[in-house]
């Protein structure tokens, strides 16, 4: 009897130790799983964000090509990259000179820009945005927009917009020649930035406001469907109206609430894009994450802009090319375009400054005396641009043969945790039965 009790006690002790070990492992794994899955809301330092934005600026500035700037789409991409790179603090002196020389090559004697016609919509008003981008670059380059290449570009911009009928600003499927939805916001910021010098500012601004209301719904912008991307490409440029017009504020607040509730995965910290095969399903997306940083930084949502920054730099940063961001694991200049916007917008938000495309801080401020800046170290961030890559990247279904990291919804750790927990429970029950005295 004593031997039986002794053996029972030993077995009890053995099973008890095993159970404790397994329980400890389960707790550790569950903690790890929760840490990996939870959004990282910790705010990075301004220096950290600026370092990342300047790396991406260097990557894009070294690939800048102004040879085909008469194309409206190319003009947009090259102008945006230059503006954001300047805002990041990266030394863009050579790029600024090359850009302005390229613009002069397509400028007529009256200051108008000789832009190529769009093959599908030859009467498109998208070229309005080319003047807007140029004005923003001129401000950042410390050039006099009222006397650039012997032309007053502010007056020219004012006259073009003032002469345009309201319908030119309201894009729709039935009005495809109007200013594209993605161009409306940048025109608005150029108008706001130069409002003191535009004699028809009030009437032009009213046209833009009517257009914004006309293209908006409670979900935001319907352009080939609804998405966070669409909402960022429009509403991130209207913070000025948001703060000065209660009607626009209510409109944008509604859109921001819908955007967060629909496209933000608060469990995994990802920002999602609708699946092309099933619009009710959403997949984590690189560009959406980058643009989320820009949208939430503009509207001072520090928690979500921090999450977007952390997710972007953790999951989508190139492991081989400094400054580049990836699209399905491969370096993509187009994802990097959006990433630079998100990074610089967040950088400026942390600095207490407005959207990077708003140059009112320059055009409406008395400039201090020019002082020499210390030379910035230059680094050779180069990569090969894939010429076949299209700006209109199709979003693949992430559910098909696409490995996911724990932060984007990998459930393997959770499954392991459940299995180990069940094993531990079984051992505890068995141990209890062995040691239970017989009646």
Descriptions of predicted regions:
Residues 48-68, 94-119, 148-174, 199-223, ...:
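Long, well-ordered core segments of solenoidal/helical folds
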Residues 67-92, 116-146, 169-201, 217-251, ...:
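An alpha-helical repeat/solenoid feature that recognizes helix-turn-helix modules
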Residues 38-44, 63-64, 88-90, 96, ...:
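Ser/Thr/Asn(+Pro)-rich, low-complexity disordered segments
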Residues 38-90:
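An edge-strand/N-cap motif at the start of beta-rich repeat modules
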Residues 1-11, 22-28, 34-53, 351-425, ...:
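Intrinsically disordered, low-complexity repeat and linker tracts
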Residues 430-431:
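Single-pass type I membrane-protein transmembrane alpha-helix
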Residues 38-47, 149, 308-313, 317, ...:
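Compact disulfide-stabilized, cysteine-rich extracellular microdomains and processed peptide cores
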């Amino acid at each position: 009897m004593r031997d039986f009790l002794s053996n029972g006690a030993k077995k009890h002790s053995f099973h008890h130790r095993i159970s404790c070990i397994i329980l400890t492992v389960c707790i550790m794994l569950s903690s790890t799983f929760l840490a990996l899955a939870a959004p990282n809301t910790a705010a990075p330092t301004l220096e950290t964000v600026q370092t990342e934005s300047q790396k991406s600026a260097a990557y894009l500035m070294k690939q800048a090509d102004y040879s085909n700037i008469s194309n409206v789409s190319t003009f947009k991409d090259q102008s945006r990259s230059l503006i954001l790179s300047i805002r990041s603090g990266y030394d863009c002196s050579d790029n600024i000179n090359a850009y302005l020389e390229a613009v002069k090559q397509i400028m007529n004697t009256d200051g108008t820009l000789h832009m190529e016609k769009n093959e599908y919509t030859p009467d498109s008003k998208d070229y309005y945005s080319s003047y807007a981008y140029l004005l923003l670059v001129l401000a950042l380059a410390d050039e006099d927009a009222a006397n650039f290449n012997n032309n007053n570009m502010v007056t020219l911009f004012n006259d073009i917009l003032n002469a345009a009928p309201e319908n030119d600003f309201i894009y729709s499927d039935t009005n495809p020649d109007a200013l594209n939805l993605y161009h409306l916001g940048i025109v608005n910021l150029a108008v706001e930035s130069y409002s003191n010098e535009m004699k028809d500012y009030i009437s032009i601004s009213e046209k833009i406001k009517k257009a914004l209301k006309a293209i908006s719904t409670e979900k935001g912008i319907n352009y080939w469907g609804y998405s966070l991307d669409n909402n960022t490409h429009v509403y991130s440029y209207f913070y000025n109206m948001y703060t000065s017009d209660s009607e626009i504020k209510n409109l944008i607040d509604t859109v921001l609430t819908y955007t967060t509730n629909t496209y933000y995965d608060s469990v995994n910290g990802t920002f999602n894009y609708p699946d092309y095969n099933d619009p009710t399903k959403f997949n984590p997306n690189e560009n959406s994450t980058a643009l989320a940083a820009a949208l939430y930084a503009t509207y001072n949502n520090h928690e979500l802009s921090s999450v977007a920054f952390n997710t972007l730099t953790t999951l989508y940063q190139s492991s081989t090319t400094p400054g580049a961001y990836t699209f399905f694991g491969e370096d993509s200049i187009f994802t990097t375009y959006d990433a630079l916007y998100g990074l610089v917008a967040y950088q400026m938000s942390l600095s207490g400054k407005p959207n990077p495309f708003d140059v009112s801080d320059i055009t409406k401020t008395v400039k201090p005396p020019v002082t020499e800046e210390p030379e910035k170290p230059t680094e050779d961030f180069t990569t090969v641009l894939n010429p076949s890559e299209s700006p209109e990247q199709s979003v693949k279904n992430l559910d098909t043969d696409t490995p996911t990291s724990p932060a984007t919804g990998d459930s393997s750790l959770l499954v392991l945790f459940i299995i180990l927990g069940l094993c531990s429970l079984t051992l505890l029950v068995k141990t209890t039965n062995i040691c239970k005295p017989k009646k």
